[in-house]
């Protein structure tokens, strides 16, 4: 189960490694000031429970980001995926572009994976998010990026399946970086 991936050593059992580096995260298109202000209104609300973080922080950011994009996107919650006996479980949120003939509950080809860190630190969810990215690749999806969030802290991951490496961005982002987080998500989904 994905929730069993708690340490880097757990992920290494899959043949992958987690390494840290300065990722070239896509940020060339900026979200509008109004969108940023709207997102910030949700962030000001207090939260402590996992479902509250999803409902009041993660979902509004995702919704505002996909509203900036042309195209049809789906936001799927608690998606069960199974690539093999070890790489299976529920992914918190998967966002993907949907083709015109698909329904909104279809997992597109290049999804963005969003993992809510349950232990209050993004570092504790690195292996879990990495395992979820690996599983998506094994299922033929071209998920390149994942993001882990507590609501306060954000960490981006990028998978390189040919090298069997999941890179974590060298720098954690915070609520004060919310505009940058939204810009990165916007550009990841735009690709």
What are these regions (language model features)?
Residues 1-143, 156-191:
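A short, conserved, highly charged catalytic patch centered on acidic carboxylates
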């Amino acid at each position: 189960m994905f929730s069993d991936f708690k340490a880097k050593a757990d992920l290494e059992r899959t043949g992958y490694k987690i390494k840290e580096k300065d990722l070239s995260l896509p940020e060339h298109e900026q979200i509008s000031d109004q969108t940023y202000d709207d997102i910030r209104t949700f962030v000001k609300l207090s939260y402590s429970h996992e479902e509250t973080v999803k409902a009041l922080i993660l979902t509004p950011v995702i919704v505002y980001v996909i509203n900036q994009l042309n195209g049809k996107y789906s936001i799927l919650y608690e998606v069960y995926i199974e690539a093999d006996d070890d790489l299976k479980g529920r992914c918190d949120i998967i966002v993907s572009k949907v083709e015109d003939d698909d329904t909104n509950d279809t997992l597109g080809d290049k999804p963005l994976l969003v993992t809510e860190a349950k232990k209050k630190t993004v570092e504790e969810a690195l292996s879990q998010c990495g395992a979820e990215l690996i599983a998506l690749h094994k299922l033929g999806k071209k998920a390149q990026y994942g993001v882990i969030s507590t609501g306060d802290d954000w960490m981006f991951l990028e998978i390189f399946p040919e090298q069997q490496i999941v890179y974590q961005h060298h720098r954690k982002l915070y609520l004060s970086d919310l505009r940058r987080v939204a810009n990165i998500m916007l550009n990841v989904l735009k690709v």
